[in-house]
Amino acid sequence: PGTVRALALAHERYGKLPWATLFEPAITLAEQGFVISPRLATLLAKDPYLAGDPDARAYFYQADGTPKTAGTRLTNPALARVLRTLASDGPDAFYRGPLAEAMVAKVHAHPTNPGVLSAADLASYQAKLRDGLCFDYRQSEICGFPTPSSGTIALGQIFGMLESRDMAALKPVQGEQGQLAASSEAIHLYSEAARLAFADRNQYVADVVDVPVTGLLDKGYLAQRGHLIGNRSMGVAQP
């Protein structure tokens, strides 16, 4: 839900085109639709949850109850109407009024996983400018989004745990379809580092306050974590 405010802030500070103009390509795509690809059709056929949501079922399923197939044109007139409202009325229309009320009602009425989002949550939300989070990896500096996002912290931990490994020596191998694929050793090392990084993420990264970012990206700490990676799967990683 924060995306609209973030886009509005970016437009306010850096935009050149009128706000409403930015919505035109997305509105056109939502109204005219796109052709479902074989990959999307396969995902729809395998998804166990969409059919349980009336709105998702109406969007992704045919009248006979089967998922829409490859080659079918998928349109989204409801999304087009929302985008037209935002284009004409501005970002506040997303956080107050009918759209906000509909979002809150939908969250509360979810049949299996109802949420606690409130109208006050939406109305009070403000986008914030934050300094990027950067870390060193070999001869490079890599930067990404800081907290409350956890992605850059996790990536920095994975890279830090693997920095002592000669990853360049783990050359790609030929896949079954003739394509290049990562070697089993490279996959193992990355997977184990990711297990450890996500264990820390789940333990330490939540609200933006009091996240120990410096400690999580400390080279000495990551070297210790990296030593936990052996030749076999560690199973469930611990923070």
Predicted regions and their residues:
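Low-complexity, intrinsically disordered regions enriched in charged/polar residues
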Residues: 38, 116-119, 152, 211, ...
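Short alpha-helical scaffolding segments that buttress acidic/His motifs in well-ordered protein cores
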Residues: 26, 83, 158, 193-197
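Noncatalytic scaffold domains of N-terminal-nucleophile
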Residues: 1-96, 100-150, 167, 227-232
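Gly/Pro-rich active-site capping loops and adjacent beta-alpha segments
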Residues: 1-14, 151-188
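Internal maturation/activation junctions in enzymes
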Residues: 167-239
